[in-house]
């Protein structure tokens, strides 16, 4: 099949194979690494007491691959299969190589980026004057547009450590206000995200049953275990914003069993 592209492409592939066999670099591993031990680390998190307990006692050990060391008693509170919701916000996996950077000078505040995000890692934020004044210095804001936004500031918050790097938001943006950049370039936005989701109030007066208005509602499905770019969790997340917490989702098993209820990472 490569021959359809020409002999030069075939030769380039052959050269790449040959280079791979000789271009490696030997790395000497220090002998003391064999007995190296991790320094004790006290996990410091805030939130609902039951979720914090679940994260500390189960989520963290399991994610460290220490699940086999957990006693049966650690699961006693979950013997009926129930887990506290919202634990996934504490994972902060940081798996995306590239994450979106928001250019406020191009943004038209359509909220389509948030609308298509499968993992709820990019969100529009409306801030009062007091909330804007207390925001981190590097939080970029513009005057909010639209009905009922007088006196409000607008921002797009991105969680660089929760983003999966799927490019959906960049593709959806009609004005090229989002560009993908290396994750490390956006790590300074993590405190901005924390402030936006934890300290800024939900503006219920802006919530409406349309693309823009729906994204001012807090998503009740976030940071799930679905694949990067998953359309299924985009729909499910949107339903939670439209219907709220008085709802059940009943469907056939499949991917939803995986992203919907991975043990300890609810």
Summary of predicted features, one role per range:
Residues 2-163, 170-266:
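Ferredoxin-type iron-sulfur electron-transfer modules and their immediate structural context
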């Amino acid at each position: 099949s490569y021959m359809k592209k020409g002999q030069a492409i075939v030769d380039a592939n052959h050269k790449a194979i040959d280079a791979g066999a000789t271009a490696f670099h030997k790395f000497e591993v220090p002998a003391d690494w064999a007995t190296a031990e991790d320094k004790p680390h006290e996990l410091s998190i805030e939130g609902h007491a039951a979720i914090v307990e679940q994260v500390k006692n189960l989520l963290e050990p399991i994610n460290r691959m220490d699940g086999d060391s957990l006693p049966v008693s650690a699961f006693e509170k979950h013997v009926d299969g129930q887990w506290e919701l919202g634990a996934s916000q504490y994972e902060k996996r940081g798996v995306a190589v590239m994450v979106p950077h928001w250019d406020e000078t191009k943004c038209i505040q359509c909220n389509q980026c948030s609308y298509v995000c499968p993992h709820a890692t990019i969100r529009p934020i409306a801030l009062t004057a007091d909330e804007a004044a207390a925001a981190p210095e590097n939080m970029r804001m513009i005057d909010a547009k639209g009905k009922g936004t007088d006196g409000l500031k607008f921002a797009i918050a991105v969680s660089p450590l929760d983003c999966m790097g799927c490019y959906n938001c960049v593709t959806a943006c009609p004005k090229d206000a989002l560009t993908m950049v290396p994750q490390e370039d956006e790590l300074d936005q993590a405190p901005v995200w924390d402030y936006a989701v934890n300290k800024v109030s939900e503006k219920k007066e802006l919530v409406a049953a349309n693309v823009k208005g729906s994204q001012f509602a807090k998503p009740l499905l976030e940071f799930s275990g679905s694949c990067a770019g998953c359309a299924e969790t985009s729909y499910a997340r949107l339903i939670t914003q439209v219907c709220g917490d008085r709802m059940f989702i009943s469907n056939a098993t499949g991917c939803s069993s995986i992203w919907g209820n991975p043990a300890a990472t609810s």
